[in-house]
């Protein structure tokens, strides 16, 4: 996920590249969460733990692992579900989230920050849909094309 977000660097004035103002408590909590881990880490001090009973969603305050593919980009959810940078104590910007979804940097999302977040998270990644449509068109035209055999038994 690191290469996807950092290569090439996103321009400072890029569209949809607005940083979220994190509360001091969120910043302090993020300092205890390692890349690839989430808010349920046992290392987090008691005063920074989430006071949630029952469900423990795996993506709450989850940091990206810079050396692995991203986890699912979501379009909604409460606090702590915005996807978090592996090193910096902050949520990803919508432009960074759009890159994870394979949108080109010149693709402009219209609307407020949460509306744009939803558009990105609810979208089918452009590169993914391209593969699907190419396979569909080749199948409909009875063309041979490269494929991978299913491993379902």
Model-derived regions: residue spans:
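C-terminal target-recognition/interaction regions appended to catalytic cores
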Residues: 3-153
């Amino acid at each position: 996920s690191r290469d996807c977000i950092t290569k090439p660097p996103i321009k400072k004035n890029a569209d949809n590249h607005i940083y979220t103002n994190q509360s001091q408590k969120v910043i302090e909590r993020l300092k205890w969460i390692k890349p690839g881990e989430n808010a349920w880490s046992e290392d987090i001090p008691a005063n920074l733990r989430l006071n949630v009973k029952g469900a423990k969603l795996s993506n709450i305050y989850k940091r990206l692992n810079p050396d692995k593919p991203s986890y699912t980009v979501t379009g909604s959810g409460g606090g702590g579900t915005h996807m978090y940078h592996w090193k910096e104590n902050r949520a990803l910007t919508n432009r960074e989230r759009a890159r994870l979804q394979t949108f080109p940097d010149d693709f402009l999302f219209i609307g407020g920050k949460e509306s744009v977040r939803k558009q990105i998270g609810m979208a089918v990644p452009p590169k993914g849909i391209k593969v699907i449509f190419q396979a569909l068109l080749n199948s409909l035209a009875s063309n041979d094309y490269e494929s991978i055999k299913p491993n379902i038994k």
